């Protein structure tokens, strides 16, 4: 383990893995970034871009010609301009982070000679055209769309190509297998070829009505004879005196049943008696003995088929047609005609079936024209076909590159499956391809070859962001193409420019629609860094062009042998999507064809090399692959005689010389989340699945703590997710505060680049899931960092390692029934010391619109509100930062004008007496919703252009400008320092031939001389050395440019700040308020370990009542031991033991650190560390101060890494426990905190890593009295989000009926629900102090009546005493 990083020296993980890792793990979000980069190709390389991505889209749609061919619009190139706003600005303003796309188009106008029709170029015009904005990907592989971060999930779909399958005997009652072939293009019509129960072969185009496959072949230009000669061999039967002489072929005659004796035509001997069957072996033996030909009689020819038309050459009369069956009758006729030889088809019904011949005879169509008409009628029913239209339509189905595209993948797959050798630029079908497919299908029916497995990863491919976007953009451009063609025909083409022909709206709309509402464009799961990474590595089989949940069967969802090392067998959701949404394995990557590849080490002559090769599922099938944990000697040879290997989905032992490849790492078969579970190999798969899913729901805690028992993957996840900040260049820390780190770069000091890196840290930002994103620096001024070192921790990271939860002391024992059924008992210490406290940031926004009655206003002056309620608002009516607010408090004061409402007589009287005009505005302030209380951490004010900014907006703007100016000044200062130091180095000790005012010519320039003048005048010094002067001049030029660039960037940003914001139409002003809510853990919150052991906190017990150990330490958490055996997740127990050892060792190291602090003796610390870590390179390289810091960091517990499938064994755990001076059983005597008595048996105690999940009781608990009602039924809404009520459902009604509580029931169903008039009456009655009221007609009854009337049934209510009752209309 190379732990020589900055953070790696502060905390060293003891590593238990034995297998060395040869391959570097690829960057975990490479899938997203590489795909989109390939699509955009922002920088145009020399010699133009390759034909892929955006370039390919433009190339495929352009050139566009008008209908008459007089003009043509060509694509030249495209380029991106700078995005208008950067990532942070887009997040804040709710914009999309995108770059404008500029396309250079060339319009060519032709002159057409009217007589000859020859074209000559009349005019060429080139112009740059704006083609909409293309969203850009952020550094972390996400997109910012309308201010929110989104991820485009990669889709798994069936690879284009040809597939052979059968119906598994389900279609026909006899259980006969009906074979079918399907050619799937990337885009275009599907072609199916299938057998029916009578063994006739049919073709279907786009799943429409089937036509005989011979019609398809007629349409391709074959005739009956050509069809037969394509599918069958021709055998010539020659007439001799004794009968017919037939060449003998063992393959053809195997399984032949004789009617008469088989006789050798040359010797006349009987080879096989009548009534017997010729076996394969017997046939082969006969051939070996030299049997050349057989003699057959006339009757044995009956039932064969003719291969050619038999025609009388003189008269042209056809005696028999190709494919005709020989019967006794026509045999006689042929004999009479005197045919000496007959060409017959090699159909024997055993090895070769007569399927195509039977199809040919069953086909009504006899000619190409008939066939084309038939296909036309199938594709376009109801339209009368003409030969031209039918031909054009058939041509466009499979042979037109505009409409049909197999894609390179499809062509490669097709060549592989059918043994063809078409180049992969041939993207349409050819006649040979279709015939090959039919041939292969017929062979399958004859029992030759295998069908395909559609769940094999060689037959499924991944479409990543770039490709999905490419398809979307192509759709947009094609929509645009139609409009362009029409416009080219309708305008005067001589005066028009490309700009006038193009309307980029359809293209931009297609992109916007894809990012905004596609099923694959998802709101990023940002609960913690792991959930971000997993979301970006997700593979979904759903989405447009994919499967649907309802249709997907069991096979698609199941784990397939080819998933090994490519798709994780563990991580997938529980529920309806199981197996349809998967995760990429740790080492997997997607190749250029979209197939998932996994790395293997090459094995040469039984020796494992360090050469790493990536193989796709198809390639892997050809090789034999050994597991990563096979024992090797130091030279890389296998130590065992038989090695267990995988080959073509089977596991089998082979000898070492037969092994081709070996796995690179044991964790290559699982995904990132599963690779974070220690002792995964000891957990049941179902629980491991829950464990990997629940880690993604862990909330970032206030104090992150890395696990004692990790797997070594923690650092990788923290780095690749972008949560922890890594240094871009090596350098020295120059300045630092809570919000930024400034590094002076020391490597590649190219004078053209800035020598300063400023890293802005995110402080208390809200994530998509309302968790808190906060980064804090890990470095001090003067620290030296290398490129890639972690300089700041983010949410859920600790010293550059992923830290989703906390290590807590656990006891596995029952406790008074409080941990029944997976409940969790917690100690009060956990709450008091904020162990599981998390911060959540809620965002509230309010808009002031322009209404018909006048503009809304954001103000502190709100009618009928006490001064007490306004105490947290500033003069602009917006809450202060730092104010503590609770439910119902005003965050932003807002008033809305209201129309004049009719006054009651009493109001009129009061108005007349007091002359006071009632205020004509109502209070529509933004208030804190119920169930929220917290602290205001940020306020943002957005104003429309041209609207005056209020005090608060100006204050925020001033603050922001100051921050930008500070950044500029710091960068400027470091730039000055670097440049002038370099300049002084160049000038010192040189002869000066010129200089600033007062400098004596020909004096030697020294540091003292330089100090006399201000630095800005140093440039005036000159020396006779021309090379030196050229260098100084270049440096000065560069310095001036850098300075100018800095100033310009600063001014641009300030201008953007002051410009005003783009708000939705009708909105004058918008205010966003962010409230930070501190959530301590409480009963009802959900917690979980990493092994799928989840539970709900049932009680928080005072510390003194918790069970305690002999040294008086109280357990933090008590779990039920019964949760382990039936769940079979024993990993949690091993983790507990190992965690116990880690803490014990940490205690010992802590004691040696204390010894150093008191006696200044570092030897005990060094010895202890050596015992724990063995000969660790990192520890040897540390100096005393670093050792003390390390010891201090380890005193809570020594962190260890036990990688998946290659971790600590039982013996290792026992050894660690002994080293820590603990009982090797891992159990301890535990005392009851309430009585002080020891429990009867020893208890398993140790440290386990627990997570607090995002299912918090505060977000779920909900109460209401009166709230909103549904519009149609007038019943109360349901659910917390709608502020709904509790449903009084059917079963609850039965309960009240059973008790005979009639009045209560009536009340529930009427006045407490949807009796509108009754509700108001009840309210009035209660106000009057009257407690009697009557129920009316529920609104839902009126809805039912209306519904019946809409069906034409008039329903009237009649009251038996009073005549017709008033329904709602009557009331109206």
From Swiss-Prot:
Q: What is its EC number?
A: 2.7.7.6
An annotated GO BP:
DNA-templated transcription
Report the domain of life of the source organism.
Bacteria
SUPFAM superfamilies from the xrefs?
beta and beta-prime subunits of DNA dependent RNA-polymerase
Any one GO CC term of this protein is: DNA-directed RNA polymerase complex
- Pfam families in the cross-refs: RNA_pol_Rpb2_1, RNA_pol_Rpb2_2, RNA_pol_Rpb2_3, RNA_pol_Rpb2_45, RNA_pol_Rpb2_6, RNA_pol_Rpb2_7
Does the keyword section mention Transferase? Answer: yes
Which terms in the Gene Ontology molecular function aspect does this entry carry?
Answer: DNA binding; DNA-directed RNA polymerase activity; ribonucleoside binding
* Record-linked Gene3D superfamilies: 2.40.50.100, 2.40.50.150, 3.90.1100.10, DNA-directed RNA polymerase, beta subunit, external 1 domain (2.30.150.10), DNA-directed RNA polymerase, subunit 2, domain 6 (2.40.270.10), RNA polymerase alpha subunit dimerisation domain (3.90.1800.10), RNA polymerase Rpb2, domain 2 (3.90.1110.10)
Q: Which reaction does it catalyse?
A: RNA(n) + a ribonucleoside 5'-triphosphate = RNA(n+1) + diphosphate
Which keywords fit this entry according to its UniProt record? DNA-directed RNA polymerase, Nucleotidyltransferase, Transcription, Transferase
Instruction: Name the family.
Output: Belongs to the RNA polymerase beta chain family.
Protein function: DNA-dependent RNA polymerase catalyzes the transcription of DNA into RNA using the four ribonucleoside triphosphates as substrates.
This protein's assembly is summarised as: The RNAP catalytic core consists of 2 alpha, 1 beta, 1 beta' and 1 omega subunit. When a sigma factor is associated with the core the holoenzyme is formed, which can initiate transcription.
Q: What is the recorded name of this protein? A: DNA-directed RNA polymerase subunit beta
């Amino acid at each position: 383990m190379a732990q020589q990083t900055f953070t790696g020296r502060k905390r060293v993980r003891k590593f238990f893995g034995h297998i060395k890792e040869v391959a570097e793990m690829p960057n975990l979000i490479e899938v997203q970034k590489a795909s989109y980069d390939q699509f955009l190709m922002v920088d145009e390389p020399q010699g133009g871009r390759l034909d892929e991505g955006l370039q390919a889209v433009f190339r495929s749609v352009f050139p566009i010609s008008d209908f008459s061919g007089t003009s043509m619009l060509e694509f030249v190139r495209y380029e991106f301009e700078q995005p208008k706003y950067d990532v942070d600005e887009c997040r804040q303003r709710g914009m999309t982070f995108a770059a404008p796309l500029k396309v250079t188009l060339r319009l060519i106008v032709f002159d057409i000679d009217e007589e000859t029709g020859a074209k000559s170029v009349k005019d060429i015009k080139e112009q740059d055209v704006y083609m909409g904005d293309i969203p850009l990907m952020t550094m972390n592989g996400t997109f910012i769309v309308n201010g929110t971060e989104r991820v485009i999930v990669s889709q798994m779909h069936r690879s284009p190509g040809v597939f052979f399958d059968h119906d598994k005997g389900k279609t026909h009652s006899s259980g006969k297998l009906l074979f079918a072939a399907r050619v799937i293009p990337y885009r275009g019509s599907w072609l199916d070829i299938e057998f029916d129960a009578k063994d006739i072969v049919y073709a279907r185009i786009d799943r429409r009505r089937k036509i005989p496959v011979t019609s398809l072949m007629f349409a391709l230009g074959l005739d009956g004879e050509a069809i037969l000669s394509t599918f069958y061999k021709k055998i010539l039967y020659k007439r001799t005196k004794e009968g017919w002489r037939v060449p003998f072929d063992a393959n053809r005659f195997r399984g032949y049943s004789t009617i008469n004796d088989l006789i050798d035509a040359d010797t006349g001997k009987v080879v096989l008696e009548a009534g017997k069957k010729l076996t394969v072996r017997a046939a082969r033996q006969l051939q070996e003995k030299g049997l050349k030909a057989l003699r057959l009689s006339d009757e044995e020819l009956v039932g064969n088929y003719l291969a050619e038309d038999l025609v009388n050459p003189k008269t042209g009369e056809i005696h028999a047609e190709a494919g005709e069956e020989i019967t006794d009758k026509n045999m006689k006729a042929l004999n009479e005609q005197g045919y000496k030889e007959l060409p017959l088809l090699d159909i024997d019904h055993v090895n070769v079936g007569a399927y195509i011949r039977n199809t040919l005879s069953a086909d009504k169509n006899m000619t190409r024209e008939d066939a084309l008409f038939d296909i036309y009628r199938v594709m376009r029913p109801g339209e009368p076909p003409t030969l031209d239209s039918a031909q054009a339509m058939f041509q466009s189905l499979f042979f037109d590159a505009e409409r049909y595209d197999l894609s390179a993948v499809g062509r490669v797959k097709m060549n592989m499956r059918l043994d063809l050798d078409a180049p992969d630029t041939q993207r349409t079908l050819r006649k040979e391809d279709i015939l090959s497919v039919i041939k292969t299908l017929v062979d399958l029916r004859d029992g030759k070859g295998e069908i395909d497995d559609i769940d094999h990863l060689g037959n499924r491919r991944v479409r990543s962001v770039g490709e999905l976007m490419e398809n979307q953009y192509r759709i947009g451009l094609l929509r645009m193409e139609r409009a362009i063609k029409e416009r080219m025909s309708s305008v005067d083409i001589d005066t028009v420019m490309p700009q006038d022909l193009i309307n980029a709206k359809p293209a931009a709309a297609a992109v916007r629609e894809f990012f905004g509402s596609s099923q694959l464009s998802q709101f990023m799961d940002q609960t913690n860094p792991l959930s971000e990474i997993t979301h970006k590595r997700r593979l979904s089989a759903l989405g447009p062009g994919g499967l649907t949940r309802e249709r997907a069967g069991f096979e698609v969802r199941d784990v397939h042998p080819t998933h090994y090392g490519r798709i994780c067998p563990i991580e997938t959701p529980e529920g309806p999507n199981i197996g349809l949404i998967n995760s990429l394995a740790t080492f997997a990557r997607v190749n250029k064809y979209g197939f998932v590849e996994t790395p293997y080490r090459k094995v040469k002559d039984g020796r494992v090399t360090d050469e790493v090769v990536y193989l796709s599922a198809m390639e892997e099938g050809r090789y034999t692959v050994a597991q990563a944990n096979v024992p090797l000697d130091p030279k890389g040879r296998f130590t065992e005689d038989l090695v267990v290997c995988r080959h073509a989905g089977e596991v089998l032992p082979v000898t070492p010389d037969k092994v081709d490849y070996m796995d690179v790492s044991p964790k290559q078969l699982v995904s990132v989340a599963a690779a974070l579970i220690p002792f995964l190999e000891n957990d049941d798969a179902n629980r491991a699945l829950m464990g990997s899913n629940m880690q993604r729901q862990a909330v970032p805690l206030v104090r992150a703590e890395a696990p004692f028992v990790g797997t070594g993957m923690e650092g990788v996840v923290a780095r690749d997710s972008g949560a922890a900040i890594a240094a871009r260049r090596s350098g020295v820390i120059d300045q630092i505060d809570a919000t930024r780190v400034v590094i002076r770069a020391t490597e590649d000091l190219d004078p053209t680049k800035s020598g300063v890196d400023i890293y802005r840290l995110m402080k208390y930002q809200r994530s998509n899931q309302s968790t808190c994103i906060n980064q804090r620096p890990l470095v001090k001024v003067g620290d030296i960092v290398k490129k890639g070192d972690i300089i700041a921790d983010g949410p859920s990271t600790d010293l550059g390692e992923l830290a989703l939860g906390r290590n807590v002391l656990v006891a596995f024992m029952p406790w008074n029934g409080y941990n029944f059924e997976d409940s969790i008992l917690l100690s009060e210490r956990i709450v008091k010391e904020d162990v599981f406290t998390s911060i959540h940031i809620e965002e509230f926004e309010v808009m002031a619109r322009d209404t018909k009655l006048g503009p809304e206003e954001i103000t502190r002056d709100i009618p009928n509100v006490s001064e007490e309620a306004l105490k947290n608002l500033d003069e602009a009516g917006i809450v202060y930062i730092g104010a503590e607010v609770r439910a119902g408090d005003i965050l932003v004061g807002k008033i809305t004008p209201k129309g004049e409402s009719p006054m009651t007589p009493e109001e009129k009287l009061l108005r007349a007496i007091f002359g006071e005009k009632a205020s004509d505005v109502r209070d529509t302030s933004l208030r804190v919703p119920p169930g929220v209380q917290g602290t205001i951490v940020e306020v943002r004010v957005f104003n429309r252009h041209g609207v005056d900014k209020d005090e608060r907006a100006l204050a925020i703007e001033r603050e922001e400008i100051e921050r930008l100016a500070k950044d500029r000044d710091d960068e400027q200062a470091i730039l000055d320092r670097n440049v002038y130091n370099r300049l002084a180095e160049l000038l010192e000790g040189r002869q000066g031939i010129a200089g600033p005012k007062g400098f004596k010519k020909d004096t030697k320039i020294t540091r003292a001389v330089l100090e006399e003048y201000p630095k800005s005048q140093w440039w005036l010094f000159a020396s006779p050395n021309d090379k030196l002067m050229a260098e100084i001049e270049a440096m000065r030029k560069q310095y001036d440019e850098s300075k100018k660039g800095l100033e310009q960037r600063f001014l641009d940003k300030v201008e953007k700040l002051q410009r005003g914001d783009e708000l939705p139409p009708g909105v004058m002003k918008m205010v966003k308020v962010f409230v930070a809510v501190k959530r301590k853990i409480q009963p009802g919150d959900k917690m979980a370990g990493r092994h799928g052991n989840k539970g709900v906190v049932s009680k928080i017990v005072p510390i003194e009542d918790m069970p305690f150990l002999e040294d008086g330490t109280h357990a933090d958490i008590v779990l039920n031991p019964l949760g382990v055996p039936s769940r079979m997740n024993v990993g949690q127990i091993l983790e507990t033991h190992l965690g116990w050892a880690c803490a014990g060792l940490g205690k010992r190291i802590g004691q040696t650190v204390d010894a150093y602090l008191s006696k200044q003796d570092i030897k005990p610390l060094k010895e202890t560390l050596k015992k724990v870590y063995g000969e660790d390179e990192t520890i040897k390289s540390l100096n005393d101060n670093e050792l003390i810091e390390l010891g201090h960091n380890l005193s809570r517990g020594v962190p260890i890494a036990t990688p998946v499938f290659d971790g600590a064994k039982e013996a290792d755990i026992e050894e660690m426990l002994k080293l820590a001076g603990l009982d090797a059983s891992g159990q301890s005597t535990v005392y009851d905190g309430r009585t002080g008595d020891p429990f009867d048996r020893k208890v398993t105690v140790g440290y386990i890593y627990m997570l607090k999940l995002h299912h918090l009781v505060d977000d779920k608990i909900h109460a209401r009295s009166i709230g909103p009602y549904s519009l149609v039924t007038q019943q109360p809404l349901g659910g917390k989000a709608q502020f709904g009520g509790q449903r009084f459902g059917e079963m609850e009604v039965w309960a009240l009926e059973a008790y005979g509580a009639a009045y209560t029931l009536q009340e529930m169903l009427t006045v407490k629900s949807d009796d509108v008039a009754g509700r108001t009456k009840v309210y009035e009655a209660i106000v009057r102090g009257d407690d009697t009221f009557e129920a009316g007609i529920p609104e839902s009854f009126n809805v039912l009546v209306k519904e019946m009337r809409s069906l034409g049934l008039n329903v009237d209510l009649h009251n038996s005493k009073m005549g017709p009752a008033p329904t709602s209309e009557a009331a109206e």
